[in-house]
Amino acid sequence: MNDALIKKVAFVTGGGSGIGEASSKALARAGAVVAIADTNLLEAERVVDEILAEGGIAKSYKLDVSADAAVESVIAAIEKDFGGLHIAVNNAGIGGDLAPTGDQTPEGWRKVMAVNLDGVFYCMRHEITAMKKVGGGSIINMASILGAVGFAGSAGYVAAKHGVIGLTQTSAIEYATDGIRVNAVGPGFINTPLLAALPQEAMAGIEALHPMNRLGKPEEVGALVLFLASPDASFITGGYYPVDGGYLAR
């Protein structure tokens, strides 16, 4: 990657923890200017402070991606603050209700769709507009291994992540000639604060779902995000790339 990302402007949603935090730090270490958005502004500010302490450049923004007007406002602010947008990591997401499809509520379904699918769409529509102004860019959408298979009890989450992959593939075709690459990453079960709160027995069961018999690390996903953001991935668009310890190969 060399110095190719130095001073490139990257926008990361859900950047205050987990995969978003790891992706933000990976991009910053490669020289990118990172705009970190999160519903939890304190966590976003913590990540910014840690990046600044390492000599990087970053700024925090409070954002709920389920509100299109809020997304538009934050991206406009990033353009004003840093002069453009070159990289976007649409990572913000929630888990949703755990229940069989027939027991899911319309309210729960709508909530997970609003963040996990609508939020990606809202971000993309404004990111694409911004990237056209600078001659192109790279959009990385955080899907999931559950964007490729089913998982009992998670109908809303699974449907949303399948939708993210379809949106990624369609947009990659539509904007290839504009120099905008669009790819999706499919993390397996990653050792984030959400999973770390589970009992040890439950953690062991989740680890066993992966042939590598462990959880992934946020930094392992961040490394792929960094590659897809870079010119090293210049002929890669419309793809879906699992980071799953062999989960989908079972």
Language model features with spans:
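Active-site helix of classical SDR
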Residues: 124, 160, 168
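C-terminal substrate-recognition "lid" of short-chain dehydrogenase/reductases
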Residues: 121-124, 214-243, 247-248
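Residue(s) in the substrate-gating loop at a strand-loop-helix junction
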Residues: 144
